[in-house]
Amino acid sequence: MGELNKTKCVSCSEGLPPLAERESEELLKEIPEWVIVSEDGVSRLVRTFTFENFREAMAFAGSVGELAESEQHHPKLVTEWGKVRVEWWTHAVHGLHMNDFVMAARTDELFQEL
């Protein structure tokens, strides 16, 4: 996982450019379970985590929520029976920022700790 999971998010503001595609593809190598998808022209990191039941899925979603609050960087979470889909992107840059890769790595770490 490299060092991404040990990195803290940094504040970013409107008007900053998103990461270049080449940079994103390089960083993606550190979080190989994630994919980059585009929705409405905005790139996002996406991964679906699977669980034995709804209770485990909800507990994981809650843990991701706590992580998001601690970093003030919030994902889209979709929780269903036995799975949680997590999407990270940065609204301020209308795409991917280093923070999204950091949070994806830290989300992976939460999952591994279960």
From Swiss-Prot:
InterPro entries: PCD_sf, Pterin-4-alpha-carb_dehyd, Pterin_deHydtase
E.C. designation(s): 4.2.1.96
Coiled-coil parts of chain: none
GO MF annotation list: 4-alpha-hydroxytetrahydrobiopterin dehydratase activity
Source species, domain of life: Bacteria
Catalytic activity: (4aS,6R)-4a-hydroxy-L-erythro-5,6,7,8-tetrahydrobiopterin = (6R)-L-erythro-6,7-dihydrobiopterin + H2O
Keywords, comma-separated and alphabetical: Lyase
Swiss-Prot/TrEMBL GO biological process terms: tetrahydrobiopterin biosynthetic process
Protein name (Swiss-Prot/TrEMBL): Putative pterin-4-alpha-carbinolamine dehydratase
Organism of derivation: Chlorobium luteolum (strain DSM 273 / BCRC 81028 / 2530) (Pelodictyon luteolum)
Taxonomic lineage of the native organism: Bacteria, Pseudomonadati, Chlorobiota, Chlorobiia, Chlorobiales
